[in-house]
Amino acid sequence: MSTRRTLSVGQCMADHGRIAHMLRSTFGAEVVAADTADEALERLHQESFDLVLVNRVFDRDGDSGIDFIRHVNADEQLRKVPVMLVSNYEDAQARAVAVGAQPGFGKATLDEPETIDLLRTYL
């Protein structure tokens, strides 16, 4: 089986590190960071990913993760890639799903069995 790839978008370094560590240790996944929407879109158009994890508010520039998800799902080439919002806020999760994301998880539940089961579908 080939290594599954995840694009982590808009996370601060500490959160990206926690997410990447969990995905590597649990699934053997490769995790690539993108700080901005433009960087993430460029990578998505040039590389193959099995999952995209998007922060609710991008650490680098304050961009909206919901807007990014909306943009990805409006792009014919990208909409087939599963996208999840990383947020502890239920209302943000509901908005993300409404614009095309898969049900996501919060950083507070990163290591919980339910989150691991959710991610297992894609990784």
Please report, for each region that a protein language model flagged, where it lies by residue.
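Conserved acidic segment of CheY-like receiver
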Residues: 3-14, 19-23, 52
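A short, hydrophobic beta-strand element within the central beta-sheet of small alpha/beta folds
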Residues: 79-90
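Alpha4 helix (beta4-alpha4-beta5 surface) of REC/receiver domains from two-component response regulators
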Residues: 64-67, 88-105, 109
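Acidic, metal-coordinating helix/loop segments flanking the phosphotransfer/catalytic sites
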Residues: 35-51, 57
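Short amphipathic alpha-helix used as the core "switch/output" element in two-component signaling
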Residues: 63-79
